[in-house]
Swiss-Prot record:
This is Cytochrome P450 1A1. GO terms for cellular component: endoplasmic reticulum membrane. One of its GO terms (biological process) is progesterone metabolic process. Belongs to the cytochrome P450 family. It comes from Sparus aurata.
Length: 521
């Protein structure tokens, strides 16, 4: 989310500043003069009164998920704020969001034309692109087909049901050994530091068919790039909401463009290598699967949209970026919750011991045997809401929602955090309670409750990698719970306060872990 527009602009002269201010004032007055007329029978959107030029940015503050949730209590599930000079509609409430993204999915399937979006994946990103026409739909379908093909790809040995299970299981087992080694040498570990490298390795294996040593510089460069991307996006780009600022120098924007260029170059190099060694009869990873689907499309005379080779680079870029940050953040929060609630950690271990045993590695087929673990994961998604907003949507035409008129090309924020903490949906939403996702006797997941939780978006822009992400989090966590007991480092209080960003992360800290004995009760 790009919700902060406080000045992150490089040095400019006094005359340039005056010209920018005068121009913005003129544009603001023109926009006020040409206000959109409200069709008969519809109401004007409610919301706080904006200040000239900066809009409601001061009221939104540095924790938008909290301030916008508070505003929804005052103005309702559909209201409007102004960020800079751009009107933004904020949607809250499960029924309202489902109405917008599912029942009126075509009306809200767009992406706003934000300046920074043009530089993500050279403006061709599946997730951020403003396009929603035939080419975008074809690329999304191609990406989904490649993911599905890869998810059913056989592992190298019969003990793994698929390639995904093999990649995750091997990396999770290595992570257990790594944490045990670090504990012996250092006495504590940074959960995010080790988890993020492990997840990056899984994504590299899935997308590129290669695994790195945890100290490999190329792998660490990827991790650092992702971290830099998150930091720059979290700080915000004022030009997204005050367009005139895109013509002024900006240090943060230069850094943002550089990060995207470096990552694009990395992916381009690996995809080029895959084209050179591609064998249709030996699909090694998601990149091969994408190339295979592209080749089939080129041979299909009935295909309306042909896929160029550069589209493969773009899709791989998207899949890598999306899967990497989301999964590593989810797993890092998982370990924090294990430490914060030791009685829940022990209950998870007992379920693992009784239902799966300690003599083999948990697998995806064990999911039905581990309902409390599944409920624990759902409650982490809900309680942390580490993805507080979806990527901004945009109205693709003049439309209405809950009786309010929403003009075409209006930027729309979906407040997932509010939905996941809505007291009308959840009993005592501020408490961490995995049992809320189980049936009355605690033996099965309550699927209806699980469907209320929102973290991967909804509708036409829903995350296409959701199933893979959920499976990866499950496997990683199952293997960690089976083998390690996590606890806090003495003298270092556990701080669960989220730090706002594209994904909300906990504060960096050090924890302890101990290998569990196979004879442990």
């Amino acid at each position: 989310m790009v919700l902060m527009i406080l000045p992150f602009v490089g040095p400019v002269s006094v005359s340039e500043s005056l010209v920018a201010i005068i121009t913005m004032c003129l544009v603001y007055m023109i926009l006020k003069f040409f206000r959109t007329e409200i069709p008969e029978g519809l109401c004007q959107l409610p919301g706080p009164k904006p200040l000239p030029i900066i809009g409601n940015v001061l009221e939104v503050g540095r924790n938008p998920y909290l301030s916008l949730t508070a505003m929804s209590k005052r103005y309702g599930d559909v209201f409007q704020i102004q960020i800079g000079m751009r009107p933004v509609v904020v949607l809250s409430g499960s029924e309202t969001v489902r109405q917008a993204l599912i029942k009126q999915g075509d009306d809200f399937a767009g992406r706003p034309d934000l300046y920074s979006f043009r530089f993500i994946n050279d403006g061709k990103s599946l997730a951020f692109s403003t396009d929603q026409a035939g080419v975008w739909r074809a690329r999304r379908k191609l990406a989904y087909s490649a993911l599905r093909s890869f998810s059913t790809l056989e592992g190298t040995t019969p003990e793994y049901s698929c390639a995904l299970e093999e990649h995750v299981s091997k990396e999770a087992e290595y992570l257990v050994k790594q944490l045990n080694t670090v504990m012996e040498t250092d006495g504590s570990f940074d959960p995010f530091r080790h988890i993020v490298v492990s997840v990056a390795n899984v994504i590299c294996g899935m997308c590129f068919g290669r695994r790195y040593d945890h100290n490999n510089q190329e792998l660490l460069n990827l991790v650092n790039l992702s971290d830099e991307f998150g930091q720059v996006v979290a700080s915000g780009n004022p030009a997204d909401f005050i367009p005139i600022l895109q013509y002024l120098p900006s240090t943060s924007m230069k850094k943002f463009v550089s990060i995207n260029d470096r990552f694009n170059a990395f992916v381009q190099k690996i995809v080029s290598e895959h084209y050179t060694t591609f064998d249709k009869d030996n699909i090694r990873d998601i990149t091969d699967s994408l190339i295979d689907h592209c080749e089939d499309r080129k041979l299909d005379e009935n295909s309306n949209v042909q896929m160029s080779d550069e589209k493969v680079v773009g899709i791989v870029n998207d899949l890598f970026g999306a899967g990497f940050d989301t999964i590593s953040t989810a797993l890092s929060w998982s370990v924090m919750y294990l430490v914060a609630y030791p009685e829940i950690q022990e209950r998870l271990y007992q379920e693992m011991k009784e239902s799966v045993g300690l003599d083999r590695t948990p697998c995806l087929s064990d999911k039905p045997k581990l309902p409390f673990l599944e409920a624990f994961i759902l409650e982490i998604f809900r309680h942390s809401s580490f993805l507080p907003f979806t990527i901004p949507h945009c109205s693709s035409k003049d439309t209405s929602l809950n009786g309010y008129f929403i003009p075409k090309d209006t930027c729309v924020f979906i407040n997932q955090w509010q939905i996941n903490h809505d007291p009308e949906l959840w009993k005592d939403p501020s408490s961490f309670n995995p049992d809320r996702f189980l049936n009355t006797d605690g033996t099965e997941l309550n699927k209806l409750e699980g469907e209320k939780m929102m973290v991967f978006g909804l509708g036409k822009r829903r995350c296409i990698g959701e199933v893979i992400a959920r499976n990866e989090v499950f496997l990683f966590l199952a293997i960690l719970v089976q083998n390690l007991r996590f606890h806090a480092k003495p003298g270092e209080p556990l701080d669960m306060t989220p730090e706002y960003g594209l994904t909300m992360k906990h504060k960096r800290c050090h924890l302890r872990a101990a290998m569990r004995s196979r004879n442990e009760e």
